[in-house]
Amino acid sequence: MPKRIAVLVTNNFDDQEYLEPVEALRAAQHTICNIELRAGKVVYGLHGGLAVTIDRSIEQISIDDFDALLIPGGESPLALAHDVRVLHFIQAFNQARKTIFSLCDASLLLSEADVLKNRMITSIRAHALRVQYAGATYYDAELVNDNNQLISSRVPNDLPIFIHECLNVLKS
């Protein structure tokens, strides 16, 4: 059964960490909704070649609208980490025990949202201490699946296993 996936993204997202999972999710018939602070805004990847139009603003949505949340890495997560509406959305998503897919720097946004206590996660090694201070157990691994609720990977090279796991989790 197709699922509804929110993709939380703003300018300077990692192009590959956005494009590859989104293409795979769409190919599996899942619905993608790009969310940010302003609907209709066009945001660009770090490498400038990928433009993404925001479908709905964070204020136009409810966690009930979605089955999972994808947060690509790059500079996008840090740019969003200072907006209380974004943090509240992530907190509500976490409290509802809905699946969060986290790539690379997305761990910093999850840390800022204070949803990592007693969780297992991977991210780039540079963020290991930060997620541990937020209460998570850090693993330096291609993929960490914490009870099908938090699926995380480190870097673009981990995308094949990450995407495979995302698709498997959405089947359950």
Give the residues covered by each predicted segment.
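Extended, subdomain-level signal for the structured scaffold at the beginning of enzyme domains
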Residues: 1-100, 108-120, 128-172
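Catalytic nucleophile serine of serine hydrolases
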Residues: 104
